[in-house]
Amino acid sequence: MSIVRLSALAALALLVSACVTAPSPSEYRAPEPLKPVDAERLYSGRWLEVARLPMSITDGCVAGASNYTLVNETRVDVLDTCQIGTPDGREKSIGGRGEILDPGTNTRLRVRYVAGFVTWDYWILDRADDYSWFISADPTFEKLFIYTREIPTDAELQVLVRRSAELGYDVSKLEFPPAE
């Protein structure tokens, strides 16, 4: 086998192994979402990422945000952005196409990034009645995000952290990246 062919096969194997897919229901460990979601209110506009569990994809990211556009009753376009290093740093972004998996309740969103090579499921575990914040997680209990419409006060943020702990998450591992 030629070196070119071996290199191509190795690159293909690396690419396939790097693909992240949505978990199977047998891997679900997160709590069930608590309230239905009004898709037009939650899946539209800009949300600030004020806390998260660490992930390699967010290393060095601050001033994170998710921008949602509700396209129709089951499709949401997603643009996740952050700044590298400081709130004035270079922007890093990734866009994806989301599918609401439970129309009507609207608490489960599957987003396909990088032309579908990376797929993540997000559950809206809890939210404010006025849609000023929400807590999102993946169903495997490994990822957790706290989003707000505006930068929260320290007291408001602590309420959201306590709520995340009540949902069963180890909040001692949360990161609080600087905001805008």
Predicted regions: what they are:
Residues S7-S17:
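Bacterial N-terminal signal peptides
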